[in-house]
């Protein structure tokens, strides 16, 4: 990767009863293409008395993408969706004008030892879709485009790249790509397949570029779309994400994303007044925090 512009470290963040590694936003780089938020969950080893319990909370102006490496999460939302997500599958929830959802350990796992590891991602919506009706789409792992080239394994989790299109129904030009090596190192050259802004997240293993070695838990932001050439060690996994940025700035407060600060202010009042749609089967209420997202 011959044109690294910014290197972002993973930073610890508390999301209630669960610690995560925050990758975006970052003070020097608030977004990459339409991607405005990425949390790395785990890897966590939960005892039989420990569970993931993220109670009902709201979103506007974005789509959430949940992708697991290990474990399982049960998703419920105010649209009526109720589904378990397992490794390799994708949950894509578009908040639009407003949605509420919860994420919890499935009931059948709540009294067992378990592992949880994955990514939680927010993708901003185009301005004309920020007030759209909410929707939810689940894509099974078997339906995600996957292929092998010269011993390197690729998955196009979302978006368009390499002449392929993921079935995940995204709303703008973007890509979210998994690249894995096996027991051999590999040279990667994919600059011509990308567009817009680009970044690379190292999940495990190491990559080398221009004599430098980069280890896990860092995002490398490219100066342009050409994440040109880099070498992956054996047993390395990276995620490349990005796409075309929007012309308007995006503002973030708590779980709200929008190009208009007044829309966020209205969403804050609506959540305080409990005017957001409810999640069937859920009764908890999370108060609006006093501070904005860092």
Residue spans of the language-model regions?
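Jelly-roll (double-stranded beta-helix
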Residues: 1-294
């Amino acid at each position: 990767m011959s044109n690294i512009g910014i290197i972002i470290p993973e930073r610890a963040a508390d999301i209630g009863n669960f610690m995560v590694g925050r990758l975006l936003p970052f003070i020097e780089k608030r977004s990459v293409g339409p991607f405005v938020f990425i949390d790395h969950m785990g890897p966590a080893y939960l005892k039989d008395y420990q569970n993931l319990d993220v109670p009902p909370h709201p979103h506007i102006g974005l789509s959430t993408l949940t992708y697991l490496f290990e474990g399982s999460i049960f998703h419920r939302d105010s649209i009526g969706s109720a589904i378990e997500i397992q490794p390799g599958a994708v949950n894509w929830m578009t908040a639009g004008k407003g949605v509420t959802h919860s994420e919890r350990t499935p009931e059948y796992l709540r009294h067992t030892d378990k592992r949880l590891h994955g990514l939680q991602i927010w993708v901003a919506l185009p301005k004309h879709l920020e007030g759209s009706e909410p929707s939810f789409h689940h894509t099974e792992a078997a339906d995600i485009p996957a292929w092998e080239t010269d011993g390197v394994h690729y998955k196009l989790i979302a978006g368009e790249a390499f002449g392929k299109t993921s079935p995940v129904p995204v709303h703008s030009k973007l890509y979210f790509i998994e690249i894995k090596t096996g027991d051999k190192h590999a040279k990667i050259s994919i600059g011509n397949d990308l567009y817009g802004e680009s970044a690379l997240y190292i999940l495990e293993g190491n990559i080398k570029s221009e004599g430098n070695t980069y280890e896990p838990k860092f995002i490398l932001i490219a100066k342009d779309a050409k994440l040109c050439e880099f070498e992956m060690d054996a047993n390395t996994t990276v995620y490349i994400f990005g796409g075309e940025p929007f012309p308007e700035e995006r503002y973030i407060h708590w779980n709200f994303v929008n190009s208009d600060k007044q829309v966020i202010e209205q969403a804050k009042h609506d959540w305080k007044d409990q005017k957001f749609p409810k999640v069937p089967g859920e009764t908890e209420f999370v108060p609006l925090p006093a501070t904005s997202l860092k």
